[in-house]
Amino acid sequence: MLLRLCIIATLLVSHCVAVSTSPATRDTNGEGLLVQTSSGPIQGFFNQTAPDVRQWLGVPFAEPPVGDLRFSSPVKKQPNGTVNAFALPSSCIQQTSNSSTIYTTYETGFLISGGDSEDCLYLSIWAPRIENIQSQQRPLPVLLYIPGGGFTSGGEASLYKIPDKWVQRTQSHIVVIMNYRVNVFGFPNAEGLSEPNVGLLDQRMAVEWVAANIANFGGDPARIALWGQSAGAASVTAYSYGYPEDPIVAALIADSGAPNIVDNEDYAHTNFTFLASLVGCDGLSSTEELSCMRNVSARKLQTALSTYSGSPSISFTPAVDNKTFFANWTERAITGKVAKIPLITGSNTNEGAGFVSFTPAGPSKSTLFEITESIIACPVAEEVKNRNLANLTTYRYQYAGNFTNISPLPWFGAYHSAELPILFGTHYEYGGPSTQYEWDVSYAMQALWLSFVEDPTRGPVRLAVGNVPANPTNESYFAWPAFEQGSDDLLVFAEGGKVMQLVGAGRIDDYC
């Protein structure tokens, strides 16, 4: 399982692309743009790309994790004047790679933009106009998104994952996206530290901040869904085990990931000590080593980590601490040590295409299938099985879309992350126009995700929209059935010309 994360970490790397988020309107007269929070007053804006969406980009939820706070648990942000939240924040320090993948050659819209920095613990918020919220007579549900990146890279500044157009269209939900520390800065696992997984603690602090403050933005703190993809999905599901009695959120969504994709066996803390030796902090006690590493420049650490090519490789991902990350997820599930809240989870039919070095012809179908199953699909299936053992409500899907503006070469198919432009509603923006079928799939998936957070107890439902029925049998109402082992309750999107259809999960599970 360590190989799974090594592959994800190597291929989902950071490269810079341009994102423009310049504010067109900074208004404080009744528009609900200046919001009081525990971090101080936050000034937002409108712009022309989504004129009915209030945006706050780069809202601090923790103090900058620099100096003595490097490698330490996050510290709540203290107010220090008005924050002008007008631009997406820098991502946390990235571990980079020169690998050639479909993301670096064709689909750069998934890559982060705007550079990276240690001062990175920010989140961004997209909400409808205040008068549109007030007309709905209750606060809005909230999707709180954790980006992926193999726990070594990633952040909120990614073209395909900017939700302003989605919020503009629905005017019925709020989206929040967070940054968190990654690689050695987020998962140092140093002998001198009591907390090896401070990146996961960053995520928890972001959840706490949103729960405490989202009402002031028009959101409902009782209707927050924690949503993530890839490493973000692993974080979401791990979160449910780490906070079984106090999850804060009401629902979970995990796209293409589960906690068992991570197997960090560095119990002796050797990775941190080895990295320390590369930057001049060798031969020290654990306390001295930690102090020395806190005084090395962030760029020097980044360069040492990103350029080391020896064997065995070194990586920094969540380590077992039996507080935020556990050695036996099945045992946690069957003993009830998991949050009793519902989950949507699933995988894509051709995840493997995102984890191979790019060639125009691509690997064989059998190779891609084996990678898909081993790295993502089977770990997700195992997590679903664990939740079934714990009698937890789980809705399971598979995404099969192969749209040319997202997958320009036929062998790409529904690769790792390909569902995200469909869900965020950005599928038409960067690779050419979308077909009506693609729009129909997007609307269906968005409707189900949103209905889930609107009422997690009821579960995801969908009404017919225009000429598009709610499901393939032309009914006007579709209720997604909770998944049970051996049932035909796997909801497949975008396959065989159908928007969605229920099938058996043997197409995945029989090969695990």
Curated annotation (Swiss-Prot):
Optimum temperature is 60 degrees Celsius. It is found in: Secreted. Residues 1-18 form the signal peptide. GO terms for cellular component: extracellular region. Pfam families: COesterase. One of its GO terms (molecular function) is chlorogenate hydrolase activity. Disulfide bonds join 92-120, 281-292. It catalyses: chlorogenate + H2O = L-quinate + (E)-caffeate + H(+). Keywords: Disulfide bond, Glycoprotein, Hydrolase, Secreted, Signal. It is an enzyme of class 3 (hydrolase). Its main location: secreted. Glycans are attached at residues 47, 80, 98, 271, 295, 322, 328, 391, 402, 474. Its EC number is 3.1.1.42. The active site is at 230 (acyl-ester intermediate), 351 (charge relay system), 416 (charge relay system). The keyword Glycoprotein applies. Optimum pH is 6.0. Belongs to the type-B carboxylesterase/lipase family. Extracellular chlorogenic acid esterase that releases caffeic acid from chlorogenic acid (CGA) contained in natural substrates such as apple marc and coffee pulp. Shows no activity towards 5-O-p-coumaroyl quinic acid, another quinic ester derivative, and rosmarinic acid, another caffeic ester derivative. This is Chlorogenic acid esterase. It comes from Aspergillus niger. The lineage of its organism: Eukaryota, Fungi, Dikarya, Ascomycota, Pezizomycotina.
